[in-house]
């Protein structure tokens, strides 16, 4: 609605009511997206814990042999432990009371590391997605997790998780989705297992929130048949019918796309 962003000048026909309406639209959109991301996050966490713990034991996340890049593994492990030490969950506090010690450098650490099903409960979506991406590509469990989430290839899931993690960070910082170009976007997928888009999107379309939102819808369809993500979005668009959703990438005839029917 601005004609000059640098000088904060608005177009002549701009109305305060429209600004307020779009603000509330964006706020409600973020809540719906956050709820869907939580579903994806819980599934990713559960699948990682199950598949990898079954094969390699509860402390698999500490084994550098399971990861493609040892330096990244060291960094991600540090982040994982830091998140665990910061958590205020009761079960974490109980674990810390028994195992928290001070190392030779004076830093707090654990004398006994928790199994994956404990420490991963408080891991952030970003940390989970980075740990998954860095798993050795040859591990059958990496592919199994991708398959469980509806995708054929683990690199497709890694790319999607990275884009969704970026979306989550935008929402967590209360930043707008409206009229935004996404720095991270989902990679293209081949031979989708479920209903998807009928054609590849243009370069411009791929930068819009629509592409990430559609990837999220695909994952929700794969992991939870009873989800209401699409219904909530459609209801929001109907409630705010005067808000032009092309600004978030919903192009003409988007409802005719197989996944959105």
Where are these regions (language model features)?
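Long, contiguous internal "core" modules enriched in hydrophobic/ aromatic residues
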Residues: 1-261
